[in-house]
């Protein structure tokens, strides 16, 4: 897959008020208009409907929705939950996505499943068990773990993946908690499917460096989920008064762990987990659209895979929750009316422009990163993406205040996109959360 890809996460329960596959299909043209390459579709499979609260995750209980159905605790890997629609609806949705020139990846939740899964009675050996025969329940998730030392289970899951690709039209998979499933299983499964579908897209919701060394295309790279993610780094800088140099530290830490594969990490500011956990403390609601745009400028130009949570493209301010649907919960779907506000229209224009720059820039796709020194390193993030053909300069004011910065190596710049940034003779004047992305004149081709 290309290094300049853009992923859009579509969570059915939050994407539309209806929360169905049919309703989502009607809005695929909208997603395509943003310049998205890959639609990441959250689980639509049959969920385990267990009313025993002791079997619910902590996040599920804290949601206050009292919804027994968790999209990440499944009962049937081949069936479509009636809440979302039918198998025909899935096929029609994937066809619509393909018609618009995009790929679609499905969520695989293989580490665990519900205790009422369709194979629970016929194949009890598929589950990991305690000595007394009870389900092995790992810390953190009160869900039964699956036993990947069982060859029949492996074949069952590989047949599931083949079905999702061949019958339902998936172009690949985002694999939930994939580090907790043996890597040799993923290696074998992907190799078998790629023999027929060599362009299969694979994403590990994990951090193991070995996983993106010839097995997965990309990974999340978030130790402890939140401790050292791109999101955590940017939130700390933008809202917790941490210095902008934290991004430099983030870069070096990832380079130490992943080497050149650090370019394979996803750069998300929100996803279904963080949006559900944050509720109304989301960056958009607390710190406003300018802070979000500052983070998205970096997320689209820094080495890695750009990632957009549904609703970010028009400043959504709704309380997203993966357990809230039309039957349970007080939280709403994303606020589509925001797309018609001045703020929402400006964000839509910004997203389309920054995505276009990302797609058409050789330096962003293939170039190395060079940090550019400035005289306010605690406030300003400044770097260049440099390829043989092109040099793209990026500078972002990460603080809610006006500043003037001087660059140690100022360039003659042709701005490609900017907001709240005025180029001076030897530096830049920034308004709060101002940014600039510019082509450095004389660096190669003169357009992006």
Task: State each model region's role.
Residues 25-37, 94-98, 251-258, 295-302:
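Short amphipathic alpha-helices and their capping/turn segments at secondary-structure boundaries
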Residues 1-22, 29-37, 43-168, 188-197, ...:
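Substrate-binding/active-site clefts of carbohydrate-active enzymes
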Residues 424-448:
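C-terminal beta-strand-rich structural cap/linker in extracellular carbohydrate-active enzymes
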Residues 2, 49, 259-412, 428-430, ...:
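Loop/helix patches that line or flank the sugar-binding groove of alpha-linked glycan CAZymes
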Residues 166, 176-261, 265, 315-353, ...:
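Active-site-proximal helices and loops of the catalytic beta/alpha 8
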Residues 41-49, 107-117, 176-182, 205-209, ...:
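Short, solvent-exposed turn/loop segments enriched in Gly/Ser/Thr/Pro and often Arg
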Residues 411-420:
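Short aromatic-acidic-glycine turn motif
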Residues 6-8, 39-41, 104-106, 173, ...:
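Hydrophobic faces of well-ordered beta-strands that scaffold small-molecule active sites
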């Amino acid at each position: 897959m290309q290094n300049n890809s853009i992923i859009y996460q579509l969570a059915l329960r939050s994407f539309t008020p209806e929360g169905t596959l049919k309703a989502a299909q009607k809005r695929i043209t909208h997603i395509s208009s943003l310049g998205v390459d890959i639609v990441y579709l959250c689980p639509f499979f049959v969920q385990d409907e267990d009313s025993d609260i002791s079997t619910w995750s902590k996040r599920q209980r804290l949601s206050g929705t009292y919804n027994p159905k968790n999209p990440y605790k499944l009962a049937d890997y081949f069936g479509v939950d009636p809440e979302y629609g039918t198998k025909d609806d899935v096929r029609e949705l994937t066809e619509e996505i393909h018609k618009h020139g995009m790929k679609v990846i499905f969520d695989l939740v293989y580490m665990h499943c519900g205790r009422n899964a369709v194979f629970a009675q016929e194949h009890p050996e598929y589950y990991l068990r305690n000595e007394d025969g009870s389900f092995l329940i790992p810390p953190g998730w009160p869900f039964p773990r699956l036993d990947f030392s069982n060859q029949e289970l492996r074949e069952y899951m590989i047949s599931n993946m083949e079905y999702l690709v061949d019958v339902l039209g998936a172009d690949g998979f985002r694999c939930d908690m994939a580090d907790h499933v043996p890597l040799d299983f993923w290696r074998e499964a992907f190799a078998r499917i790629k023999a027929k579908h060599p362009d299969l897209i694979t994403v590990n919701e994990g951090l193991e460096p070995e996983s993106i060394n010839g097995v997965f295309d990309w990974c999340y790279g978030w130790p402890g989920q939140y401790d050292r993610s791109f999101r955590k780094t940017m939130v700390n800088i933008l809202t917790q008064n941490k210095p902008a140099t934290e991004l430099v530290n983030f870069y070096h830490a990832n380079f130490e762990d992943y080497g050149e594969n650090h370019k394979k990490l996803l750069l998300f500011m929100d996803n279904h987990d963080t949006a559900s956990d944050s509720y109304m403390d989301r960056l958009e609601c607390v710190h406003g659209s300018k802070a979000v745009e500052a983070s998205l400028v970096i997320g689209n130009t820094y080495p890695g895979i750009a990632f957009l949570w549904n609703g970010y493209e028009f400043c959504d301010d709704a309380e997203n929750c993966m357990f809230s649907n039309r039957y349970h919960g007080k939280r709403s779907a994303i606020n589509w009316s925001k797309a018609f506000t001045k703020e929402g229209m400006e964000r839509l224009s910004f997203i389309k422009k920054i995505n276009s720059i990302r797609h058409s820039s050789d330096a962003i796709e293939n170039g190395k990163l060079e940090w550019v020194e400035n005289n306010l390193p605690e406030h300003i993030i400044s770097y260049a993406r440099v390829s043989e053909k092109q040099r793209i300069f990026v500078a972002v004011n990460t603080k809610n205040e006006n500043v003037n910065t001087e660059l140690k190596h100022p360039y003659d710049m042709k701005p490609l996109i900017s907001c709240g940034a005025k180029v001076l003779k030897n530096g830049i004047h920034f308004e709060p959360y101002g940014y600039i992305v510019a082509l450095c004149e004389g660096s190669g081709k003169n357009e992006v």
